[in-house]
Structures are given as C-alpha cells and as structure tokens.
Amino acid sequence: MSKLRLGVLFGGRSQEHEVSVMSARSVVKMAKKEKYKVIPFGITKKGQWVGPEESWNILNNGINEVKASKDRCITESVRVFLDHKLDIVFPVLHGPYGEDGKLQGFLDCLDIPYIGASVLSSAAGMDKEIMKNLFSYHKIPQARYRVYRQNHLENGLDGIISEIDRFLGWPCFVKPANMGSSIGVSKVHSPGEVKKALEKGFYYDRKLIFEEFVEGREIECSVLGNDQVEASLPGEILPGKEFYDYEAKYKDNKTRLVIPASLDESVIDKARNLAIKAFKAIDGNGFARVDFFLKNNGVLLVNEINTIPGFTQYSMYPKLWEATGLNYPDLIDKLIELALEDR
C-alpha cells in the first residue's frame, strides 16, 4: 500500500513564525513513517515558499526561522509546492496568513485537502471581534469587552477612557483583534497606561479588543471532530508572570501546565460542553483549542478559540489529548482522517 503524501506547511509571514517552526518540527517527527511520506514546505517571513530539501534542513538542525537560498516570485513559490502532488496538507501556521482563512482558500482553489478549519471558521476564529459576536449570539458566557478602531482616536483618548471606566473597569486587557500567542497584548492598570497600550496594539492590527480583567484560573480544552465533536479533559496554565504573554508561553520556563486540571467533575463537564459549543459557534471542523477563565466564584467564561493551536510535543493541545487517551501519532492519524472525511 502506498504511503499518503503529507505536506506540512510552516513558518509564514506572521509574528508567530518561530512558534510555527517548532510545531512543524514535532509534527514531522511524530507522524507515522510507515503510513506517510512527509514533505515539508517552509514559508519565509516575506512569503516565499521553500522546497522540501531546504525545509528538512531547517527542521532537522534546530533552525527557527525559514530563509530561502534564493528569491522566488509567487509563481515559482507555488510551483515548488504543486510539483509534489500532495494527498493532504497540514498547515501548521499560526496567526495571520495561515490561520485566518487565506491559506485555506488557496488550498481549496487547488483542490488539495487540508487539516483543520475551513475558510469561514478560520476567519471567524482569527478575528476576536467576529468570534465574540458569534459567542454572544450563541449565548456563550464570556468576559465583557469593547472594540476600538484607529479612527476612534480622532477625538482623543478621553472618550475611550470614560467608556472603559464605565463598562470594564481597571485593570483591563488590550488585544489586537487578529493576533495570537498574546502578541501585542497589554495589561492596563490605569487610564495613564491606555495610550501606550493603544500604540502597541495598533502596531499589529487596525482594531483592538479591550477586555475586562477576570480574576481566576486559566483553563484550556482541546476539541476534535467534524459533525461529531468531542472535547478532551481540561488543563490549567499556571503562568510565572502577571499574565500569560508570548514570553511566558514560549521562552519562560517558569510557566507550568497542569494536565489534567484539578477541577470538580461538574466544572470538567461544563468546560468540555462549552468547548464544543464554542467550536460549533464558529462552524469549526477538524480541531481547535478553547481557552477559559474560571472565576473565583466558580463561573466559567470562554476567552477564545484557536483553530491552529500550538502543536509541539509539549503544547497544551496534544498533551490534553494524551491525558484523555489519544497519543500524538494517533492524534495526527485522526486529524488526517477527519480532513479526508470532510472532503
């Protein structure tokens, strides 16, 4: 029986480039060699596609940035990809240009099956404003928030500060609407810190989410499925910093993951059910990770959904499934099965 030709896309133009490389390194290592011919394709920060030989060199030698040995126009980049006649693609690309529906639409046009969310659900899961609107429509509990665009600054900061003071209070969080891995996020303790947080956030996006600060625990749940959806046991993040930012996620070894989380059975059941509900709210398919806040009074709030979560061997998504009874190589099998089923 011939092996399935599995393309693994990684790197990309987003600020989460290095995280993507680390995730892909785990995927190519753990995919079953007897079942798949793994063919990696790196994408540089400029959007150039790199062929398998160069990509293997990056993955096998601990290099965390994709660089092309020569400049390629878009036609050459696509040709590098198409020449390998892939059966399926795993886009291990986090953030804009990989997780937001653009790449998924490209693969749809090429009629190549791929793992994970569709164009629609990718876009909805990437844009926090759209995501939160969908959660509201489906009556999914979440933290209070406000959305601001750059044109809201035309009348100065006073109106924004007044609204935050009335509706959210201090401290609060400021987040770019279309970034992941907590890139560009600020914790704002007082009105005097708003200007700096806006400047930081608008560097990454044209609209920002202001979100109330929630005192409590950070819980995560992994989701898997198409029409029939299941959720893993939940895990807990114990950040070594004031909040779980990019440094805490990927560079600070003080952060601890508790898998599975120590929770009452009723909270576990509620987290799993809410994770599935959030997944269905964005019309999800394949896989996703859903993040929660567990308030000190026991109320569970959905924070966000990630349609291409971190996928290193040590990332929460695969570790939660391992704790639930599905190991990493079998998880890859299941994702491929779901992707082909969805065609």
UniProtKB/Swiss-Prot annotation:
Gene name? ddl
Query: What does this protein's record comment on cofactor binding?
Result: Binds 2 magnesium or manganese ions per subunit.
Q: Where in the cell is it found?
A: Cytoplasm
Q: Which domain of life is it from?
A: Bacteria
Positions binding ATP in this chain are 165-220
What terms describe the molecular function in GO for this protein?
ATP binding; D-alanine-D-alanine ligase activity; metal ion binding
Needed co-factor(s)? Mg(2+); Mn(2+)
Family annotation (HAMAP family): Dala_Dala_lig
Mind telling me what this protein is named?
D-alanine--D-alanine ligase
Which species is this record about? Halothermothrix orenii (strain H 168 / OCM 544 / DSM 9562)
Q: In which pathway does it act?
A: Cell wall biogenesis; peptidoglycan biosynthesis
A biological process (GO) of this protein is:
cell wall organization
Does the record carry Isomerase as a key word?
A: no
For Mg(2+) 1, which residues are the binding ones?
Answer: D291, E304
Reaction catalysis annotation: 2 D-alanine + ATP = D-alanyl-D-alanine + ADP + phosphate + H(+)
Under Pfam families, the record lists:
Dala_Dala_lig_C, Dala_Dala_lig_N
The answer to keyword Cell wall biogenesis/degradation applying to this record is yes
Q: Indicate the segments forming the ATP-grasp domain, all copies.
A: 132-337
